[in-house]
Amino acid sequence: MPLLSKCFPCFKFKREEVIDKLDYSNTPLTDFPEVWQHERTLEELYLSTTRLQALPPQLFYCQGLRVLHVNSNNLESIPQAIGSLRQLQHLDLNRNLIVNVPEEIKSCKHLTHLDLSCNSLQRLPDAITSLISLQELLLNETYLEFLPANFGRLVNLRILELRLNNLMTLPKSMVRLINLQRLDIGGNEFTELPEVVGELKSLRELWIDFNQIRRVSANIGKLRDLQHFEANGNLLDTLPSELSNWRNVEVLSICSNSLEAFPFSVGMLKSLVTFKCESNGLTELPDSISYLEQLEELVLSHNKLIRLPSTIGMLRSLRFLFADDNQLRQLPDELCSCQQLSVLSVANNQLSALPQNIGNLSKMKVLNVVNNYINALPVSMLNLVNLTSMWLSDNQSQPLVPLQYLDASTKTQLTCFMLPQVTFKMNSIQAQQQAQEQYEFVYANQQQPHASPSRRICFAEEATILSNAKAQPAPNYPSFVAAPPTPTPDQMAGSVRLMRSPTPYPKELRQMSKYVRQAQAATSSANASEVREARVVTNGQIHCDSNNANQDVVDQATTSAIYGIAPETTHIYGVYQQPQQMAHPVPTQEYYGLPLVNYEAHYQQLYVEANTPLPTTHLNGDQDYELQPLQQQPMQQQALPTPRLEPPPYHIARVYTKKTPEDLNLYESMRQRKQQQQLQEQTIYQDALNSNSNFKTTAIGAQDVEESVDQLDYQNNISNNLEPNPEEEDQELDDTMSQHSLNSTATNNTSKASHKKSTWIFGVHKNPTVKQVTLKWENSIGFDIAELLNQVGIFVSSITPNTNAARLLNLNDKLLEIDGYDLTNANLSDAKRVLLNCGTVMNIMLSRK
């Protein structure tokens, strides 16, 4: 044949190119490659991260395909033609949008590896259990709630990963998985380790981390071939003693649980190399830990250990020891026998000294003793020739610092400029409070240039300095009351203002902070007055308004926390002087002001007329502190400054600035439903007003119309909220009706000041909130009424749950009127008769505490 092709070139055949592997990974594809041209020879096809939307049917002509990777794409389904790939052994479909698996996949009899992780399966089809050749099955983050009952048919399975699902139990048929070597059920909803796990005797790796497991059954001791056990982030408080049968375990990690002690049998884990048990409640370690001859890494941080056992010196292979954030007071001298120790970290403890023979740890490279009570270092530290980092302070700039002899004559101790360590250590709550106070102080100073000249406390000697009068000896006023003197123009020109800015805001808050400061500067009052003189008077000499007393105490407590004021609250009184540009005269009556502490929060000043001056109080012997009369400014001239608005914390702002589209759609649907509900209620209420208007008297009808207008205005205002809160809406309505009632009362008192005081009609409600509600009922009214002992009127005695009455009424609400019928002087029988005669929609006016 070769001779014939040479003599006759027309008989020369072109040799077919053999291609058995194609790799298009990480290449965006607009069109699917024509891989079917190699359908006879193609065995491996890699299409990872290629933005595929679907698999074409021509792909399945390659019936010799053994490996198919289509992970990290946008596939929404698996074609039914997948069953034609009968030689397929490795199928990777993770990180797609697949919601179901076709039944035809059971035709892939030779499939050994199947990865469906990070898809929205929610349910595993029974066809998967027909793949009896399957050895590796990865179903991580697929929203599974259960496994098929016949899952045990996969007898050849070696690796099973079910991490990050919603599983609560495992099928009992898994006992047949005699070849299973790795089981990962972390991140599920298990509350107890399934009994079937203890029967998987070939298991080598068991991951049960981040569940809610409280107990591990004793049959777990049957896992004699176990090498890796991970149980972090559970609720374990004890471990079974049967774990001593794990003679081959090398890694044991049980961090972030509730363990207080280990069983003595933990020392029987002869092959243990890594032992992690941080973030528990351990108070001590068992002495049997000395039998862990192969242990190289021991992590004990974030526990409650008071001491380390002396037998720890028997750990000859120990290389890493972490015991930070405990309550250790000393380290045992036997620790210096761990010749292989290279990293020792015991920060945030109560150590006062290090072992004298610490120099025997010749392989030591890193030593961390930050935040302890160490005064000096032993002289044997000079023998640590391999030491590369020695951390003595959080503010240490270099890993190593030069050491000197503490006493040149004895030469037994070493020191440096960071020793002795500071003995004062704040707990987490104190540190958080101090950080908050520093932030508020710095932020207040930063905002001061933008604020307008509002009220400030200025003492007598400061006023003298400001007016360039003759200097007088400054009396010893309390330092926490005095405000810094206002600098003169000469002082302003000759000084440079230095200010430390806080940490920059996140990117989302910078523009918000800018607008807040501009709004403050624009809305601050330009005509505000200044306090020229102030005196300090104790609480016992001042009568505070009951409506403002609680808020004043809170503000004063906050001021005390920031500036270190004594616990006893003081009230400050000042003399307000009328600005010269005021066009209206100042009243001549004398007024004493209510307590003024935080002038930015309490910008509305209230005054009560004083009939007699307060007595003079003598403090500190010789010095007199007198309460001076205040002059009230006309209300129309007082600008109401906007309270200082600090930027919200980052974790709150992030919620409002980084919402996902799903969240925004959800909020929009909630808002639309709430608007529709409010419009329906408004329509029902308006119809009820129109139908019942003929039964009301003239006076009551006018009042109802006025109150209904207020209620409709209120409903129109709240309809624009994104996420209305029913409790907040009721509170605002109560405040609106209460304010309307108070205004009406004030008007009547002004016009009829000479009339005799009328009888209080609200019964037990000493500070009532009168409101009108529209109650619609179907099967029953939803509430009962009764008369209270020694009280006049009709009150709500009981409410039926899950009714409109339960949402609108409260117990002990006093009923003033029902559908125009006055109940203030009615008896119980008349009131019940009114309830029986009313329709399915009733208008109720009531008073509430």
From Swiss-Prot:
Keywords: Leucine-rich repeat, Repeat. One of its GO terms (biological process) is protein transport. Residues 725-735 have a biased composition (Acidic residues). Gene3D superfamilies: 2.30.42.10, Ribonuclease Inhibitor. Residues 770-849 form the PDZ domain. SUPFAM superfamilies: L domain-like, PDZ domain-like. The keyword Heme does not apply. Transmembrane segments: none annotated. Pfam families: LRR_1 (PF00560), LRR_14 (PF23598), LRR_8 (PF13855), PDZ (PF00595). LRR repeats lie at residues 18-39, 41-62, 64-85, 87-108, 110-131, 133-155, 156-177, 179-200, 202-224, 225-246, 248-269, 271-292, 294-315, 317-338, 340-362, 363-384, 386-407. The keyword Repeat applies. It comes from the Eukaryota. Signal peptide: none annotated. InterPro entries: Leu-rich_rpt, Leu-rich_rpt_typical-subtyp, LRR_dom_sf, LRR_R13L4/SHOC2-like, PDZ, PDZ_sf, Synaptic_Scaffolding_LAP-MAGUK. Residues 716-752 are annotated as: Disordered. Residues 736-752 have a biased composition (Polar residues). PANTHER family: DISCS LARGE, PDZ DOMAIN-CONTAINING PROTEIN. May have a role in assembling adherens junctions. Belongs to the LAP (LRR and PDZ) protein family. This is Protein lap1. It comes from Drosophila melanogaster.
